[in-house]
């Protein structure tokens, strides 16, 4: 939140955060105290004589009125004064309409006369209520209210039974005694409300008195409330301090400040006052009138009228939408906007202005595609970039760059808009300011224009999921639209038909950092919603990729070269062509293999892959090239299409993301697009009308098919007319007919479509788009070529509209295909007018559906989000909401994040017992097999050792148990589960990395496998803790993964299938552990919002209405959005309630028995089995009028068992339908019994035999005997009889249940088609088998009764009515049911949502023990704070409630904090940072008085480029400041060669006075220091010297492009020809620096500490940069003491985590490897030789470990061919000792782990006074060097800088000759020969090249040309980029696999002799000349 203060917008003092918000009602005296208008506002006018009037409605004390004016209260101006409240004293109190209902509730709870609670507060019930409702005052009131409702008398003394006020006279004594309740004992009135008035009415108090009803005036209520005691207030749920009952009645009305009701000034007319002001004027007027009338003693009814009016005005000011009241209007007739309307609704204050605001620094324009951008870039128009600014703080490092921007001003781009001084003054650069204003100082802020590389947030509405707002890097481009990469359109759901998108430029570095680390596009590639990528390759690239990877694509050399030009990660090697003769040709697959990153392994299929191939004999051949195999990063076979490159789980992109990390995947996307699109330019892809034409035979076919279809339809119609059509079960005749017709027509369409497709050639362009998956489907093709097909509206054929026909052009009752919407033309042929009309009808329906659906799903999504917004993973790993209620104990029940899991198969679940044993049991009896798989010694061990055999048996037992467990968990045998760590792929990776030969026996001991897996599963911890509960929870969370682990890594499969070596197995275990730990959900993750988005987003894709799917046995279930709505609303009456009834035993298999149960369930009334009924007058039963009944009726009457005389002459004859009777298994007897049971003796019912021709029931009324007596009324009676009989008839037909359950109207019986409803059993062999059993499905539900039926399976039977399940089975059952129903809704249309999101929603809805609907009735009844509730719905009601009860909001949720502008406790806001004050002492001061800080000052040079990848390390981070001279600033820590983390900045010459005149800079300056291409901690991979990079490191550095083609920036001091201390080629030559003579041991080019491969090695310094003794202290791990090299601190920089040698988050070989740390990224020093966790000799990461694979991006010197212990590299060869006999890398003083190098070694202690790197102790190559050697003290004569042999000025050893002078013109770095005046020293002459034998500064033994160490030797040439740690694909061990030849002349930017100015001389040239 920003306060006032200086105009910078930030207030000077930091604002405290708001901890909680207390609600309450203001008391009248408080209102008066806070009011600024003493005496109240008395006048309705606003002004008087043109001045605002004191005491009027525009009182100047209330705030500023004119723009220029000041406030009379606080003297602030318009922006500063917040406004002040006034007040109006009301003449009579009035009700507050918001509290009216509360007022009534309280009134009903207290005595009308004595204001005591009607229930004694000692009543146990009250005590119970108080205990139960702690902290829920609202509940308390409700309960107390329920208790008091029944009481209609105020309880007197202790005699509770004292009903009538007999003891009233002694009431006074009662009060003094205080024994009982002490009430007055009088009758209580009922309180009623009418409009805004309350009435009290008494019902006859005593027998004689009448009811009396009086109007309750607000005064009276006020009096009653005033007498309520504080304790009783509390019982009533009020908080006496904040909200007493009498304050709910308005006596003093607050007048809002002027800023809340500003007047609008219209030109030329008076001010237009705000609605509120108008309202207040009305109130003041009527109030004054009322006061006058009262004082003048007016008539009562006048005053009553006035009070009523005042009441009305006060009410409508608060709420102008009161029911039953007229609206308060303005003169124009527009209703006024009341306070309530200001708050509520989407546009209201809360949702419109607090929860969501309009923001600055945003831009919006149309988007257009640009495939050449990277996926995380966004092209921004220059016009926008020049308008949006970013405030950058001036530091010594960026002052020159900013000064330059300021100089350019706002008119030129890039420039700046404002300078903000440190005192807050803002200088606007748009209006030419004084030049003196433009001077910058550190601490100022410059608002500079947006420039390349800035981080922005890009967003497209509707923002349905988190992938709709992602971070991009800016790329400024001409023209006026945002450009973005095509692959990013999928997550944004964007297309380029005119979509607009928004861009937000974050304004602080913190925000930037968060976006960069959390929200950048590459990090969002995989969505947690369904654990798959959301970005794939689309459109033309996808079409092209399919064409490109076909078998017959060959490229010539020229084309290959051309394509490689577009491959940014190319390592400079062209692969061997696939075809050599007659001319070299490369295949598309080969080129694609270059694009695939790393060592990816992947198997997919092409979209046209035939299903039967996988099992057939050709499964390895794949005749159609449809099986895609990528092995070790090479595309071996297969055509790529959407399946491998699209957004599916397990696609190439997905694997790349999981294995290689997001950054490499980003390059993968870009490279595919640039390379493939450029190939497509050569190849071409077009589509024309020709593609839509098939051959004539096909058209003939199509015609015939359609003709036949029409014929079939006519036949069906005729059948229906002739009544020959049998209705299918459960359908009417009409439905059956429609279904059949539909089927015929659809078959016709499909058939024609497929024949049309078959006719298309392989080269058809429609087809190629469909096959690749880029656009369209088979149906689209067939519609274009063959037939458009049937048009539907609401799932049926086009309905009749005009008098039994669809259009007037058809005859009536035409059911034929044409008339009902079958379009038989194709799009190519064109539609006839009627067809076109029907087609338009179908299309229009789709549009309407979409529009309606959008609104529905939008609201659903909002409710979901609001209900779960504050649910997050806390630091104890539980999932809780804002009020700390546990929702889940572990997120997703396994504690893992959704992005990092994949589908895997559980191997043990499916196979039969035999297969299981064969695959998993280690068979130690079969010796031959063992010998094949294990090495000899292991075989002996296994065969001879019983202990081992027992272990192996135990392992198998364990797996068998696992299998049993799995079969319980997955009873259906579905083995696909979502787990972290794809084990099979990891094993495959291991096989590739360790070059496992599957034909050789393995050296992996089976026991090692068993033990290893056991150990590993102990390490995979989700739940910490040792108590039984934690242990159980841990087991539950990791059970599936452990089972998967044990079954995949079992000894048998390890030996037989995988054949891993011991080494590989160790690697695998380490990898699994680190991958598993990376997959754990992060605390602070807002999983609630994530789940809501993940469910809401698929909902928008769902269909809205459910169509009746034709042919499904007519049983309809609601699906799609309506069903989702029912579920989350927990609707009591779902549209289609239904039970799925499973049966037991015999009845499940026997249709007859199933039918019995069906009859027992289905509700049958008499009507359902009745054919017809009739009423006859049949006075003589013996000879009935119905002749056909005569026979059997006589039988009855011959021997009547009833009184024939009582029988009524009226007869009800019911004829039953035999078919229905038998269908429902009913007999006549049963029916008659039911009737007799229902009506008893009042009816006589006789029936004929079940086998009779017609089934007849005859029913007569039995008259009672006395009716006979009253003869004279007989006629009436007889009339009665037949009417009565009518009633009985209708009652019997509808209401009488013959059998079944009332609620179940219909039951369907069928055999399940899908597996999930079949009964799955496990056979004896242990296989799964699905049996078809009869299942019943019902319309209507009655779970309780159905479950108790005989033969119903009570376990599997389910209901889809959630509420019913809750009532019958309880909360756990309903949770599972809800989850299943939700899953069913979502998966119905083929979407997949990860289980954790569904689970979270279900848990949110059920975790309170009752069902919480996701509506205002559920969400807003939780105990969350009022602010959260009011941001959802019912805004005003919630706030009123909160005020009345004095609630407080603890500010723990998300909404609350957003409303108050605070950081929400989510994500990075849910923890605090701890600052180590001790470490801050090591911080570095930056002297600001740096000489030469001009435009060409050193820092200007550095930051002249785009912000470097790191953005510059802030000086305070690094502790290198001992002994800094004023020039020290020049060596700012972040200035060094291209941003190496600890770059040359801390160079000795910084501390030495030698560099006194330093603008001159060190060669360590990479000419493009900040360029993205320079090696920096955040861009580990880019600086591969290869690729399209010029020797000067990176042509992509924006700053250098325009200014200096060769990479020299002319004004950069480093290249200033006269700069004395700089000579780009001088090895380390600074004539004045005594310590740096070229022979200084720390300099020899071969000195280990000077590894040319260290990233900071700048291309122009041929051998050594004077500023960095160990060549960039962070050079990832080479430089013997690297990590410990900091003069002041053992670990790099205590404050910068990324430099600490032990930093856990870095590893050079990253993705695939991490010895001890969960996540690595390559250039970290933690790989340094001294880092304890990784010593090159550490056994399991031995230098030969292939894991340092050729492409491992950052190859550090621990790589095999350079690891000191690596046998193949043999640095131990005597002639390698780099310049000193006792300094062989294996010598104790060097070995990286050697104690003498440890930073803590005594002579190296950081506290040693001036332990600068150039102090002699640090010269590793000096012969007598031994760090602990006492003789080596810095003052030792041997090393005195003035010692003749060392001093650069001494004639003996001036590198060139004594006459060399720093200013000598010949010493210009740009002079072509560049010789510092002496031939022997010209770096371009062979004699002095580091490879020349004569140059061996201190040690004759080490000639750089010595064979083992020739720098040009391909294995290790210090100059060869191939060996540079940053080169992405280089492995010294495999020169053959590597693709970069070290001798390639043009490419070795790091070569010492490679002087930029003489490109012709390359390291090997000079070598040859020697």
Curated annotation (Swiss-Prot):
Pfam families the UniProt entry points to: RNA_pol_Rpb1_1, RNA_pol_Rpb1_2, RNA_pol_Rpb1_3, RNA_pol_Rpb1_4, RNA_pol_Rpb1_5, RNA_pol_Rpb1_6, RNA_pol_Rpb1_7, RNA_pol_Rpb1_R
Binding site for Mg(2+) 1: 493, 495, 497, 499
Region of interest called Trigger loop, as start-end residue ranges on this chain: 1083-1124
Keywords: Acetylation, Chromosome, Cytoplasm, DNA-binding, DNA-directed RNA polymerase, Hydrolase, Isopeptide bond, Magnesium, Metal-binding, Methylation, Nucleotidyltransferase, Nucleus, Phosphoprotein, Repeat, Transcription, Transferase, Ubl conjugation, Zinc
Residues with the N6,N6,N6-trimethyllysine modification: 1866, 1873
Effect of mutating residue 1268 to R: Mice appear phenotypically normal. Simultaneous knockout of Xpa leads to growth retardation, skeletal abnormalities, cataracts, progressive motor neuron degeneration and death at 5-6 months
Protein name: DNA-directed RNA polymerase II subunit RPB1
